[in-house]
Amino acid sequence: MAEPSQAPNPVPAAQPRPLHSPAPAPTSTPAPSPASASTPAPTPAPAPAPAAAPAGSTGSGGAGVGSGGDPARPGLSQQQRASQRKAQVRGLPRAKKLEKLGVFSACKANETCKCNGWKNPKPPTAPRMDLQQPAANLSELCRSCEHPLADHVSHLENVSEDEINRLLGMVVDVENLFMSVHKEEDTDTKQVYFYLFKLLRKCILQMTRPVVEGSLGSPPFEKPNIEQGVLNFVQYKFSHLAPRERQTMFELSKMFLLCLNYWKLETPAQFRQRSQSEDVATYKVNYTRWLCYCHVPQSCDSLPRYETTHVFGRSLLRSIFTVTRRQLLEKFRVEKDKLVPEKRTLILTHFPKFLSMLEEEIYGANSPIWESGFTMPPSEGTQLVPRPATVSATVVPSFSPSMGGGSNSSLSLDSAGTEPMPAGEKRKLPENLTLEDAKRLRVMGDIPMELVNEVMLTITDPAAMLGPETSLLSANAARDETARLEERRGIIEFHVIGNSLTPKANRRVLLWLVGLQNVFSHQLPRMPKEYIARLVFDPKHKTLALIKDGRVIGGICFRMFPTQGFTEIVFCAVTSNEQVKGYGTHLMNHLKEYHIKHSILYFLTYADEYAIGYFKKQGFSKDIKVPKSRYLGYIKDYEGATLMECELNPRIPYTELSHIIKKQKEIIKKLIERKQAQIRKVYPGLSCFKEGVRQIPVESVPGIRETGWKPLGKEKGKELKDPDQLYTTLKNLLAQIKSHPSAWPFMEPVKKSEAPDYYEVIRFPIDLKTMTERLRSRYYVTRKLFVADLQRVIANCREYNPPDSEYCRCASALEKFFYFKLKEGGLIDK
């Protein structure tokens, strides 16, 4: 986007001229330029009737949410008051309307009269009394020029009622802006209000429509806009997810866009306090555009209004994202009790992660989502289904149909169920199936999703969970829990930075690199400072920086070798007064996710004796799987240090892993409690210990088997410890199963063309081709996973097809065969 060479200076922070003073002749007021700063304006006179100010004053509030009725729509109450005021004046008798317009109309008695507006000889003594006073007579003389009112409104005699009402709407907006200029404390904002005030006055005078002209340009100011970029981000990052999870991300994106459209930006003065000087001029241009085209028109609807996310792009988003993200997350955290339970988890758990991933694409150097020709053809079943992403009526309003994503081409969630089923044997499970038959079809360990969702609502509902406040960390909380919470609240930030010669790194990055050099030098005293400085500022090295309160408190310096398939970790440190807070673990987790994104799945590092413990906790091992030929001569060797390796799993969301495990444990605990509540029988206590018995087998405890407990001792002994041996065994077994005559229905995934509703009935589809791919990718780390998938192949077939079908007969034959082979290979009990 081509930006103006300098920020516009709308007009000086002078007061507007009195409402009855002469106004300039032109209708389309050019957007103010710096040259206008030398032209003072007269002191204002009282407004005819005070009205609501434009949505959300920005002078003292800064960036954040206004104090309107709806916390997500700053200024909504001002907008309502303005609408009510306009409805009042439009309902006045025509004589009263002409009187109000006469106040803004020049006298036409003769060419020598310079009166720019009729002054009532009997002005109202109190605010809003002008509506209660009787209409002035057209013959009533002006207090200033002593010409009758008729000479001021003669041009309105043959004007339609609709045009009169349009002009009256601008009158109310002028009154609003007049009050805003008085109330506003910020100089830049006051200047824009004053400029718009003059523009609307001239439009009333000349009966034209307002047009903002000058160096600001006209919308849209950037392409692609913010909305398109965010939707590209969802497609780019989440198209591989299941439809339900992908729809969740889509709804989060729409919620973010909606909040951004009603968010109040910080003033240029506030922006200047936290940013480097070269960014301020560009931000001031965008801020002025935002006021003129987006913010003020929310309540002054005489001005054309545009959505922030439709007319701005990456430039503005880069300027505001960090502070907006922090304030938005803090707002939702404070108002979490206002959220409906099913949305609380969505916002408090998934939204922070969503914003973190979006931040990487906003500030990343080569993100494809901002390319004008971004295309990512969706695979089968990856199209997003636009739905109103309402979170709560008290927090985020429902989406307008005019926003992107609500086209007629959207998929219907119920469309698949209405298609006629082609002729064939496959059909749903008969309704008359007995309970015992249904139990037999289930794969061991399956839990109904309805039950899991119910438990999730319980453990995320503060009212349903007794005990201490969840925001207080327990003694056995995960190491990175504190850091994760601080990141969600915007207290800490993570940025991948590095020195650059072409183009030259900006000032903020250079300051952070100096801070990193100081942290590494202080925490690694045995490492020469010159050596640290050389690597930190080397353009080939990057650093994941941990930022708190605008300063660097830690980081991991690394060098990527994409052609060799690994990254070397060079330095890793957190400043001493910020340690033992989980920052080191969270740093490493962010680094892992960054490398998964760039398809590098191995870390190598030389750890000294003090760092070995830390790296072991982060999943590093002294067992090096990367061939020596791939790293020899590439990485730096240190005397007395130990080479360690960490292999990354691309399926693991590392920054949320401990939180996910915690949630899984809570779910299991609640499910166990529900299971225990279903067991009505109460057994007497054990008396054997009174007789001197010190220990008994667990299986001898009365009622233990009824709870679902099973002895695990025998199964543990059969687990193959050697991964290569397990892989070979399972590979041979799967090959025998695939060659069985009855395996033909299960060789490949079921095609939708053959069974349109299959994936609605079967929640966890599996087939022998998928199992082969999983085996090849070393998914089956235990034989239990392999056996479970085999069982699910059979269970899915029996659930979807009638018992007497050919498919079920094949399933039964194959089941007997593979159980025989499993027993023969010693993989299950005989």
From Swiss-Prot:
Give residues for the crosslink Glycyl lysine isopeptide (Lys-Gly) (interchain with G-Cter in SUMO2): 721, 752, 784
How does the entry describe the domains?
A: Loop3 is required for substrate specificity and adopts different structural conformations in succinyl-CoA-bound and acetyl-CoA-bound forms. Tyr-638 has an important role in the selective binding of succinyl-CoA over acetyl-CoA.
Where N6-acetyllysine occurs, the residues are 542
- The residues that the entry says bind acetyl-CoA are 572-574, 579-585, 610
**What's the chief localization of this chain?**
nucleus
Name its cellular compartments.
Nucleus; Chromosome; Cytoplasm, Cytoskeleton, Microtubule organizing center, Centrosome
Q: Name the enzyme group at the top EC level.
A: transferase
Quick one: where's region Disordered? Answer: 1-94, 398-426
What is this protein's function per UniProt?
Protein lysine acyltransferase that can act as a acetyltransferase, glutaryltransferase, succinyltransferase or malonyltransferase, depending on the context. Acts as a histone lysine succinyltransferase: catalyzes succinylation of histone H3 on 'Lys-79' (H3K79succ), with a maximum frequency around the transcription start sites of genes. Succinylation of histones gives a specific tag for epigenetic transcription activation. Association with the 2-oxoglutarate dehydrogenase complex, which provides succinyl-CoA, is required for histone succinylation.
Q: Which family does it belong to?
A: Belongs to the acetyltransferase family. GCN5 subfamily.
Bias-annotated ranges (Gly residues): 58-69
PTM statement from Swiss-Prot or TrEMBL: Acetylated at Lys-542, inhibiting the protein acetyltransferase activity. Deacetylation at Lys-542 by SIRT6 promotes phosphorylation at Ser-302 and Thr-728 and subsequent activation of the protein acetyltransferase activity, leading to acetylation and inactivation of PPARGC1A.
| PANTHER family, sorted | GH11602P, HISTONE ACETYLTRANSFERASE KAT2A
Residue ranges of domain Bromo in the record: 721-825
N-acetylalanine is found on 2
Q: Where is the composition biased (Basic residues)?
A: 83-94
The molecule here is called: Histone acetyltransferase KAT2A
Cellular component, GO annotation? ATAC complex; centrosome; histone acetyltransferase complex; mitotic spindle; nucleoplasm; nucleus; oxoglutarate dehydrogenase complex; SAGA complex
GO BP annotation list:
cellular response to nerve growth factor stimulus; cellular response to tumor necrosis factor; fibroblast proliferation; gluconeogenesis; heart development; in utero embryonic development; intracellular distribution of mitochondria; limb development
Subunit description: Interacts with EP300, CREBBP and ADA2. Component of the TFTC-HAT complex, at least composed of TAF5L, TAF6L, TAF3, TADA3L, SUPT3H/SPT3, TAF2/TAFII150, TAF4/TAFII135, TAF5/TAFII100, KAT2A/GCN5L2, TAF10 and TRRAP. Component of the STAGA transcription coactivator-HAT complex, at least composed of SUPT3H, KAT2A, SUPT7L, TAF5L, TAF6L, TADA3L, TAD1L, TAF10, TAF12, TRRAP and TAF9. The STAGA core complex is associated with a subcomplex required for histone deubiquitination composed of ATXN7L3, ENY2 and USP22.
Listed Low complexity bias regions = 398-417
What tissues harbor this protein?
In brain, highly expressed in the hippocampal CA1 region (at protein level). Also expressed in the hippocampal subregions CA3 and the dentate gyrus as well as in the cortex and prefrontal cortex. Expressed at low level in the cerebellum.
